[in-house]
Amino acid sequence: MMTAGKLRIGVLGSGKGSNFVAIANAVERGEINAEIALVLSDVDDAGILAHARAHRFPAQFIPPGKFRTKLDDEAERAVVGGLQSAKVDLVVLAGFMRVLKGEFLRAFEGRIVNIHPSLLPAFPGLLAWKQALDHGVKVTGCTVHFVDAGVDSGAIIGQQTVEVLDDDTPETLHQRIHAAEHQLYPRCVAALAAGRISVQGRRVTWKRD
């Protein structure tokens, strides 16, 4: 995914945007050969928009429409159009709480990434940290993956493990997974920006330095 210049990143988020902050900080430190081209949110007072504007990144609220779990067609066209106008190379989902549909997936096929709080394919979907506790696993973690039409089912780019402690609660485990996400996501985006990621079907390999 390496481009002639810096990778242009578009970010979608619905909440505080802590993973976006981790990536943006890595960009500003020169650890990722990229620039934040656009930040979009379906929540008008989302923290991710406030942070983006405070750091003078282009940021916009997109009214999501009438559905609770997905964008309506008009909103999806607005998101696609905004990202295309910003000449985005890679779409980064950072706590975006709506399902992406066919038009969006086709427009950015192979160029959308997400992070999930489990070691996929284990525990897809919501409350993955609670699923891990309920199943009694001893190790969980987080996964960066490409986005496809399924639920947390795209090809896996990278993973980081987190030990499950005997006295963990859903809240304490979630906090440690979240901290791991802030390490893993920038590392994976940096590898994509540097052209170090190769994809063949479901197999993703990293070119070593």
Q: Locations of the language-model features?
A:
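One-carbon transfer enzymes
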Residues: 1-209
